[in-house]
From Swiss-Prot:
It comes from the Eukaryota. Signal peptide: none annotated. Belongs to the ATG17 family. It comes from Yarrowia lipolytica (strain CLIB 122 / E 150). This is Autophagy-related protein 17. One of its GO terms (molecular function) is protein kinase activator activity. Keywords: Autophagy, Cytoplasm, Membrane. One of its GO terms (cellular component) is phagophore assembly site membrane. Its main location: cytoplasm.
Length: 408
């Protein structure tokens, strides 16, 4: 009986640590699972936030690139407006130069261009400094557009790289085990641990029986009947033969517990890697945000410079258009002046013809009047005293139409 007691004692001593180890492994597995769950929640939250931030960053550079290209198109159109205004001025001045002066003028000018105040329009005609203004405006875009494109490409590459790593992590998680599989592993490990506890209880009962048998054999306690010790010995000897198998089964169950809990640990480790990836993404996004701030500042400067450039061009175009309108009006007025000169010449010629005609009629009327007076004197003069009227013998007066100081 002493031998059976020692064997039971040794078996119980060997089983205790195995069961305790099982409980310790399970406790760590439960903690690991809890950590994995929290990491999963954080990872999912960060993943959604990062996906949104990557999308915003991509849209930012896409919009910045589109907006800058539109600004470049606007600047290009303004250069076209500038050239058109300058061309219109050159054309207007060319028409003045090609229009000869057909009237006598005091300054001896040969064409209408000579009436232009060259000092007043020299800035519009020569366009001094405008090449530099145009080039400065274009240089902004030559620097900014490639910079925006480069940063946008960096964002897209970084986004794709993180997406690739996330896909690999996700694929690895899927291949390892699913979320439901993790709980299955833990449940299986807990079931094995319960089996180990049951086996440990069996060993404890066997030990208690061996202890009673030893007490019975030494007379420490009295048997309930005369056959108790013999029957108990037979049972204990039979159970003692199964002790190695029980210990082996405990070890097998412990191995199964460890295996299942290792899966939980692996899952937690992988979730930690996924979470770490999202944290690294955050660092990448923060770097992108700094770049976005710098890009935004450059874009705002470009918009401000472009606005100033557009105002300069608009001012030049407005001033030049006013000059063109003035000289076009001058040309049209000169053409109207030529028609006015023709009209006046025709009117003067007509008035001169009328004066000639009137003078001829006046001369004829004067002759006729003189003849009529002479006929009167011839018929009635002999009967009238000579001093009766001083003008009796006077001839008819002569009248004449003539130009006086440019007026009739």
């Amino acid at each position: 009986m002493e031998q059976l007691f020692r064997e039971a004692q040794d078996a119980l001593a060997a089983a205790g640590p195995l069961c305790q180890e099982s409980q310790d492994v399970l406790a760590r597995a439960r903690q690991n699972l809890e950590v994995a769950v929290h990491l999963g929640i954080r990872t999912q939250f960060l993943a959604k936030a990062h996906a949104h931030q990557w999308t915003l960053a991509s849209k930012f550079y896409s919009n910045a690139l589109t907006r800058t290209k539109k600004s470049l198109e606007t600047v290009t159109r303004q250069q076209t407006r500038f050239q058109a205004a300058r061309g219109a001025l050159e054309e207007a001045l060319g028409e003045l130069a090609a229009t000869p002066v057909q009237l006598r003028v005091n300054n001896g000018a040969h064409n209408l261009r000579e009436f232009v105040d060259e000092d007043l329009i020299s800035a519009q005609v020569q366009g001094k400094g405008w090449n530099e203004v145009h080039e400065e405006a274009l240089n902004v875009f030559r620097v900014l557009l490639p910079e925006i494109q480069r940063h946008g490409d960096i964002v897209n590459r970084s986004k794709k790289e993180f997406e690739r790593e996330k896909a690999e992590q996700t694929e690895l998680l899927i291949h390892q085990t699913s979320d439901s599989g993790i709980y299955d592993l833990l449940n299986s490990a807990e079931a094995c641990s319960e089996d180990m506890a049951n086996l440990l209880q069996s060993l404890a009962r066997h030990y208690d029986l061996c202890e009673r048998g030893q007490d019975l054999s030494t007379g420490a306690i009295e048997a309930e009947d005369v056959n108790e010790l013999g029957e108990l010995r037979a049972v204990l000897e039979n159970d003692a033969q199964q002790l190695p198998d029980v210990l082996d089964e405990l070890q097998e169950r412990l191995d199964e517990v460890k295996q299942g809990c290792q899966g939980v640990h692996n899952h937690m480790t992988q979730m930690y890697h996924s979470y770490s990836l999202e944290v690294r993404q955050l660092e990448g996004i923060q770097a992108v945000e700094k770049t976005m701030d710098a890009t935004l500042e450059i874009c705002e400067t470009q918009q401000r410079d472009t606005k100033e450039y557009l105002l300069k061009v608009q001012r030049y175009v407005s001033e030049t258009s006013a000059v063109v309108t003035h000289y076009q009006t001058f040309l049209n007025s000169y053409k109207a002046l030529l028609h006015e000169a023709e009209r006046r010449n025709a009117a003067e010629a007509k008035m001169k013809d009328y004066v000639t005609e009137v003078n001829a009629k006046l001369a004829q009327m004067s002759i006729q009047e003189t003849n009529r007076r002479q006929d009167f004197v011839a018929q009635q003069g002999d009967y009238l005293p000579a001093d009766i009227w001083d003008e009796l013998l006077l001839p008819s007066r002569r009248f004449e139409a003539r130009e006086l100081d440019g007026e009739l």
